[in-house]
A protein has these predicted regions:
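Active-site and adjacent substrate-binding regions of carbohydrate-active enzymes
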Residues: 1-267
């Protein structure tokens, strides 16, 4: 191939689409495509990065499920900016076109998961849900085939930085909302499980250790997306050297119960 490491932007955008619609069908289809490619293609997987999110989704498929491109992009932007009823996400638009109604989105992982709004409202229950969503998405990323990348600040749940608006050279570019300097003062809390930073940092560190230690999470494992029978729960199965690892990821805020059609001893 031209490039041996590929930036997995489509999966990233499709992941956030899934967060907003609570429907994993498009994400499963995207993962099926990625997992069917030859092993020499290695993907760099991420939830957020330095750039904006452009909603480059498979609209031909979405149209079959009554999701038209223009109104769906508007919905996603309304949802993640917090302008849709029930959304706890926060962020800003970039390159907003008033004629075509098209726009791209900017925000950190933590703010998109609701950590910013929960902190502002000082709502403990909302914060617990937001942290669970943040960690679930990272666990899902660690299960994917490829190389997981954690963007600076995500390891401590860093939220949007609005101070860019005070800088004359930056205030016109909303992408700086997720390009803020690393909050070293907040990083001091990383070992305190009673803080947001501590809960996220300690759990991500645990995930990293498992990813590094377990061969089944390595590059030679067979990775497939599993049809769980529930459109709100994504299943990912890894198989290597006679062992199998199943990951279940609930893209709804409610508890779910599933039956695994497998035999054997589980741990």
């Amino acid at each position: 191939p031209e490039c041996h490491m590929l930036y997995n932007v489509t999966t990233m955008a499709t992941t956030w689409h899934t967060v907003a619609v609570h429907d994993i069908r498009l994400l499963k289809k995207q993962l099926d495509i990625v997992n069917s490619l030859p092993k020499e293609y290695t993907f760099l997987n991420y939830l957020r990065c330095h750039d904006d999110i452009g909603w480059g989704l498979d609209y031909d498929t979405l149209k079959q499920w009554q999701m038209e491109e223009i109104p769906h992009k508007q919905y996603l932007n309304d949802y993640f900016t917090g302008n849709y009823s029930g959304s706890e996400s926060r962020g800003e638009l970039y390159n907003d076109d008033p004629v075509t109604k098209d726009a791209r989105f900017c925000g950190t992982t933590a703010s998109m998961c609701g950590i910013e709004s929960a902190g502002f409202e000082q709502d403990e229950e909302k914060m617990k849900k937001a942290i669970r969503k943040d960690l679930m998405l990272h666990a899902y990323m660690f299960m994917q085939a490829g190389i997981p990348m954690i963007y600076s600040g995500d390891e401590i749940g860093q939220v949007n930085d609005y101070t860019y608006k005070e800088d004359e050279e930056k205030k016109a570019d909303s992408r700086y909302i997720h390009r803020g300097t690393f909050k070293w003062d907040l990083a001091q809390n990383r070992n305190d499980q009673d803080t947001v930073e501590g809960q996220i940092f300690q759990t991500l560190s645990y995930m990293e250790r498992i990813r590094a230690q377990e061969e089944i999470l390595g590059p030679d494992a067979e990775v497939t997306a599993w049809d769980t029978g529930d459109q709100e729960v994504l299943g990912i199965i890894r198989k290597y050297n006679g062992k199998s690892l199943t990951g279940l990821f609930n893209f709804n805020n409610c508890k779910k119960q599933l039956t695994l059609p497998e035999e054997g001893i589980y741990r």
